[in-house]
Swiss-Prot record:
The gene is frr. Responsible for the release of ribosomes from messenger RNA at the termination of protein biosynthesis. May increase the efficiency of translation by recycling ribosomes from one round of translation to another. Residues 139-159 are annotated as: Disordered. The lineage of its organism: Bacteria, Pseudomonadati, Myxococcota, Polyangia, Polyangiales. It comes from Sorangium cellulosum (strain So ce56). InterPro entries: Ribosome_recyc_fac (IPR002661), Ribosome_recyc_fac_dom (IPR023584), RRF_sf (IPR036191). This is Ribosome-recycling factor.
Amino acid sequence: MLEDVIKELREGIEKAIEALRRDLAKVRTGRANAAMLDGIRVDYYGVPTPIVQMATVSVPEPRLISVKPWEKNQVKAIEKAIRESDLGLNPQVDADLIRLPIPPLTEERRREMVKLTKKNGEDCKVAIRKHRRDANEMIDSLEKDGDVSGDEADRAKKKVDDVVAEGTKLVDTVIAGKEKDILDV
């Protein structure tokens, strides 16, 4: 029973950290990253569609993303969606290929990106604390129902705290790595 609580806690923390990594992949660092385009939707015959479902997205150079639509008639729609996104990119159309040069980030923009990164990290830590609270409540209810002894419950709570500390440390490592990427010129 207690093993299930700990297992569920670990899974919840892993999901929170995976969500953090996905969110951070979309944050601009000054280097080209195909995941930057994940949040952009293109109007495809009246349906908002992710670019990756309409085109091949590649990173041929460190500061260039290339987008090759599978249907040539969608080039203008994809260009418009990229231009209107809040990424600050200026698409260059070359026949049926869209090139996205990634401009270097200004110092001010880098600071904004670091703030956003820290906010994402803090949100992840809040989610981890919520998982800890849920696990502790489950342990308390098992103890109250008489399914586990007080000593077992105390050991399980200690284990919960250790798992949470491990998860929080991993979040700090992920955030520090992303901040380093952003601040590297």
